[in-house]
């Protein structure tokens, strides 16, 4: 059963909350990745990659976002992007890039530790100031408040578009990425993969 649209506060307010949560320097919030198995009365159930099913209450101001398939052509100067990267041979190399809709510019801006895998990785949400082509790769110069990064985007990197989502996208069977609030009691945001898409972050 899909949740009523009335369960969601305005997307604008939810986006602000999501940004504040993700912008915390220590990034203490837990993440849950898995497949949506139920959504009813403000609570969702998710089967994790480990096969466990967890029940998660949504915060009243929870944000709802959708990722859809994209490609390297979307990575352009002036775009605001999120990138999960790893240190490889003395440089940062992207595993995935999510290109934000312009309405989400500035969301969770910064460069901070991430948890895509057990080995150290970082999330960088920043503006692309320059794009260079180096062989088949692209090298991005990125600027954010308080710093800058240079990250290589190989052709193997997953690229998705990231936008706000209506409640009807919260459908059973969809892959989801969930950001819990600081005390772990409720979901602050849910990133939903479009049909056939897994949130890569």
Give, region by region, the residue ranges found by the protein language model.
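Short, flexible, surface-exposed loop segments at domain boundaries
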Residues: 2-5, 17-61, 65-201
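Sec-dependent signal peptide hydrophobic core
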Residues: 11-16
């Amino acid at each position: 059963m899909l949740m009523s649209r009335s369960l969601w506060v305005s997307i604008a307010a939810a986006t602000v909350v999501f940004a504040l949560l993700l912008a915390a320097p220590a990034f203490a919030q837990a993440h849950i990745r898995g497949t949506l198995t139920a959504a009813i009365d403000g609570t969702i159930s998710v089967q994790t990659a480990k096969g466990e099913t967890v029940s998660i209450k949504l915060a009243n101001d929870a944000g709802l976002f959708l990722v859809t398939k994209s490609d390297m052509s979307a990575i352009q100067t002036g775009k605001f992007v999120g990138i999960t990267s790893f240190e490889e041979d003395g440089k940062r190399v992207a595993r995935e890039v999510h290109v934000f809709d312009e309405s989400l510019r500035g969301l969770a801006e910064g460069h901070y530790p991430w948890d895509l895998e057990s080995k150290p990785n970082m999330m960088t949400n920043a503006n692309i100031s320059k794009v260079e082509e180096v062989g088949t790769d692209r090298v991005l110069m990125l600027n954010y408040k308080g710093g800058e990064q240079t990250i290589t985007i190989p052709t193997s990197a997953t690229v998705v578009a990231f936008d706000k989502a209506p409640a009807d996208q919260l459908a059973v069977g969809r892959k989801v990425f969930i950001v819990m609030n600081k005390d772990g009691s409720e979901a602050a945001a849910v990133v939903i993969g479009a049909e056939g898409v897994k949130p890569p972050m």
